[in-house]
Amino acid sequence: TFSMLLLVMSNNFLQLFIGWEMVGLVSYLLIGFWYTRESAITANLKAFIVNRVGDFGFLLGIAAVLYFAGTLNYGQVFAQAPLLAQKHLWLTGHFAVAAPTLISILLFAGAMGKSAQIPLHSWLPDSMEGPTPISALIHAATMVTAGIFMVARMSPLFSLSVPAMTLVLFIGATGAFFMGLIGIVQNDIKRVIAYSTLSQLGYMTAALGAGAYAGGMFHLVTHAFFKSLLFLGAGSVIIAMHHEQDMRKMGGLARYMPVTYVTFLIGAFALSGFPGFAGYFSKDAIIDAIRVSTTPGATYAYWAVLLGVLVTTIYTFRMIFLTFHGKPRMDAHTREHLKESPWVITLPLVLLAIPSLVLGGLGLSALDYGHFFGASIVNRVGDNPLLQGAGEFHGTWQFFLHGFTTPAFFLVLSGIAITWVCYILRPDWPRVLRKWFYPVVYVLEHKYFFDDLYFRGFSMGARRLGNLLWRFGDGGLIDGVMVNGSARCVRVGSSVLRRLQSGYLYHYAFAMVIGIAVIVGWLVWR
């Protein structure tokens, strides 16, 4: 809490960086809470190392701010923003990068690490190794939100750079769709929710890239509640299942855990963006803002986030049907002891279900189409897609009714229907579909091979390079030539000189005669 408050309330880049690093450190420690588990230690180390890559870019961005603006104070930097647009960094004699573009891209590298954007996203699913309440905290209110907040806070700089905004939009929209696809093939209930976080972070990032900063922040707020609800609901299920997390070994839990089921269902509808729930108001505003955005690549981003609605609904209700519906698939002992979790677990679910229902409608006017953020968020003149959509906004009630006519609503219905048919009506179909689309499933199950690339390409590659350098550099050059080579030269030279010291007097007399002859000859010749 202290770290996030420091990050949010800072008024200069130095304080921001301190809070930024403290959030990363605390998250690293929380992920490794079960320090006796090798998987937990590997996960927190992975999170720490991946974020170091992003934080290196973030630190370079802060250095660029100091170089171009001469200060780290927000107010002074933002006041100089129009002047920064006229400054450039010449990389070659013919190629220069505008200062706002360089600063924004470097700062966004940090956001890619903290907010788990492609390609620095791979640490987030592994953070599930921590306790479930820790997962809820990291995915809802701390680590992953830091990058989204930072980009929105730096909107005066990002808005000056079309290339940076295009990059942010492309990365976000790609993550919103393709990270959601991985969630469809996951069987661990917590990992499904983890990949939903990656997808929803993609929506927030895409909103920032489209210039809808308030929309991204609004979705961050609503997402915090229903994502915490889903994680804690998953924790309730895991406790009832005696710490089993494989959804294939669940089923039929709705009759045993009614409170968990109803609250989990509310979170599922909010995540899917069903009209009336909190997620609908924030997500549909983002989709609409991207539709009218002038950022290059907005057409691709619009279709990516729109199809992401279908993907989100499929993995969400696949989780619902596998966990709470159908025939019980757990062992007899677990089934005999199934019961609702105690009130200390269900009460937080009920409390989180309330904002997951009503927060979107209550906050839409102020957060999305109002002036809640004031001067904290800056757009290019005439380039705020939320304001363009505000002309069609006639109040929360009309926005709610409009939701039943949008393409996103029909995609939600289609996703629910698809999962109901595949997992309730015809539960044998998923196995058939898996065989038909096995190449696609194989790629998704291997998470687009990012982990393989990082482990075999970078980690193992670095080790092989290190071994090569050690063998030829340290062993061959330093030890072989410089250290042992010097000793070898001394040994060879001393052995030659040793033969000259024979101990016979006539050898020395002969050497003296030869020496005198050489000297006399040289004097005569000269």
Predicted regions and their residues:
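Alpha-helical transmembrane spans of integral membrane proteins, capturing the lipid-embedded, hydrophobic core
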Residues: E21, R52, F56, A224, ...
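Long, highly hydrophobic alpha-helical transmembrane signal-anchor segments
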Residues: V185, S199-G209, Y280-I290, V381-S414
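Membrane-water interface at loop-to-transmembrane-helix junctions
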Residues: L124, K339-L347, F399, F404
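Aromatic-capped, Gly/Pro-kinked transmembrane alpha-helices
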Residues: S365-F410, V421-R526
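Alpha-helical transmembrane segments
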Residues: G180-I182, M319, G415-I424, I519-L523
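Hydrophobic transmembrane alpha-helices and their helix-loop junctions in integral membrane proteins
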Residues: T1-G19, G24-S341, P355, G361
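Membrane-embedded and interfacial regions of multi-pass energy-transducing membrane proteins
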Residues: R52, F68-L72, V77, G172-G175, ...
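Select subsegments of transmembrane alpha-helices in polytopic membrane proteins
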Residues: A136-M143, P342-L352, L505-A511
